[in-house]
Amino acid sequence: MTGDDRYTVISADCHAGADLLDYKPYLEKRYHDDFDAWAATYVNPYEDLLADTADRNWNSARRLAELEADGIVAEVVFPNTIPPFFPKASLMAQPPTAAEYTMRWAGLQAHNRWLADFCADAPGRRAGVAQILLNDVDAAVQEIRRTKAAGLTGGILLPGVPPGSTVPELYSAAYDPIWAVCDELDVPVNHHGGSASPPLGDEPAARAVFMVETTWFSHRALWHLVFGGAFRRHPGLKLVLTEQGSGWIPGVLEMLDYYHGRLVAGGGPPASQFWGGRAPGVGRGPRRVWGG
C-alpha cells in the first residue's frame, strides 16, 4: 500500500438492540399482554442502558455518525439490550428452563425481527447476528432459515452451555441439524466470550473469578465441536470465537492434537478405555480442522 491508500475498517464485535418498549411491535400479538405486565415491573440492571447515551444501541443515524467518526464503515452486530422476558442481557443469561423457554424464545425472535429492520436501514454496513436457543432444535433451525431470508448476514449467536445446564453439551449429536443448516446456508456460528460461564453466586470474589474464568468457558465450544465431529460431518461449517483473544489458540490446538492422537488416532487401550469406539466420528486432527 502507498501512503495515499485508505484502509477499510470493519468492526467485528459491535453490540446493539432495541429500547425495551420498542420490542413490543416485533412480538407476536399473543404475547403483548404478558409483555405489558412484564415491562411495567422490570428494572434494568445496567447503568449504561439507563444513561443518556443508551440510544446509540438503537438510534441508527447517531450510530452511523459515531462509527464514521471513529473511521469504521461497517459492523458485525451482536445483542446488547434486554429482549422481552429476559432478566438480563441474553448474551449472559443461563439457558432457560422448560418453563421459561416459550416466553424467552418469543423475546429473542422479537429481537431478530427488530435487528433485520435495523440492518436494512444501513444496507451493506450492518451484519446482524441472529439469536437462537438450544432447547428446541427444530425451532432453532427454522429461525436460522427465516433470519437468513430476512437479510441477517452476521450468522447466529451460539448460546453458551455452562456445566449443569438444562440442555445437552455442545458436543451432543442433538445439535447436528443446527450445524447442517449453517453449513448449507453458509451461516457463521458465533460464540461470544462471556456466554458460557456457570452462575458463581454473590460472594465478593465472584466477579474476579468470573473475569478470570469466563473466556475459558467460552473456549470450550471449540473442542466440543471438534471432538463432537461437527466439522467432519459438515466441512463448510464456520465457527467464530469472538471477544476471547487469540493468544490461547496455538497452545490449545497443541493440547487438542495430543488428545486426538492419543485417544483417537492411536487406537490402542486409551481409545478403548476413554473413547468407547467412537474415534471414527471425530475425523481430522484439531489443527487440521482449524487450518481448513
Placement of each model-derived feature along the sequence:
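Helix-coil boundary/capping segments in enzymes
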Residues: M1-G292
